[in-house]
């Protein structure tokens, strides 16, 4: 993408158009839906009927919303990129209309993935994101010789094709594990001729749906402060110089890799067992699992942060600097990436402790925490942007993560938290590994610099 679109007005247009669908993708994929759905699904006595109704309700609402945007996308385009001029808005509007349909596709993917989580099947969910990226890459390769505007249309349809591929990936495990039959039979259960059974199922479904939606909306808010903050940063960045939206997007994409690979993956895999342990009142088991996950995440995310900051320019250059992506774009993107990485530990560790809140069905408390950190982060963005420009937005995002972490730990309980982190041996191992990494990277950078200078002067 950086090779073909670079970091300018056309890349900004796509990132703005893809921002809202991508926001929903990250919110749903990172657990907001499953952390509300799974506890309700586990507790439901009519699992198939409950799940099928949830799926139909969401699909119906999202389809109508997508249709509304397709018929009149201008209002949403102005909302997403208020700082764009009229000509750029005109180019952006049809791209927004196409990409918005991905909302419906990503919900279906997330819904099917949540059902598979119940059966402890994570393969489809883990690999579905790669299908989206693959389809986007194929679309860009096909449009390589096209104009930038034509490439935007190819890329947008590539997003939709990726969404369909993600859904299809879930079908085989759904059928194999009997979940497809569960959904189908659950829906047919509402058509039974037995009046008593039908009345019981309808009443039970109403209660389950009411309980689910009561938890869902606070869960979305509570689990998506980072995504909403990033969304707001894109809107604010549209007032800055051309390319600012792209710098944020490219840096954030790399930042999301360790976050998704470790923090989100572990929290997603851990959530069903935490929810069941809480239901069975196994507090010691919960604390034991959280402690193991804590030290693993601290170690891995700290090493990723150190490595990413020390090699930020090299990583950005390797991934993006070709074609339309200039050395200046590399420098700014690498600086943004380094500032994003300051928030990797707090954002990643917050995912771990928020599990406890969601498993206890305390979504309202999580939503309150998220709102506070979101407003503090927004205030930081507006304060730092005039001083640091796009770098201020990245720094504010990391500060928002720190606020979120402190507030989540407060809700979890400082005494319980101190009990989890009390392990001197683990801390010493992490400190040793961090020191070794720093020394190795310093030696590596020095060696590469000397090698470059040697061959550079040899050329003369």
From Swiss-Prot:
It is found in: Cell inner membrane. GO terms for molecular function: lipid-linked peptidoglycan transporter activity. The keyword S-adenosyl-L-methionine does not apply. GO terms for cellular component: plasma membrane. Its main location: membrane. Belongs to the MurJ/MviN family. Involved in peptidoglycan biosynthesis. Transports lipid-linked peptidoglycan precursors from the inner to the outer leaflet of the cytoplasmic membrane. This is Probable lipid II flippase MurJ. The lineage of its organism: Bacteria, Pseudomonadati, Campylobacterota, Epsilonproteobacteria, Campylobacterales. The gene is murJ.
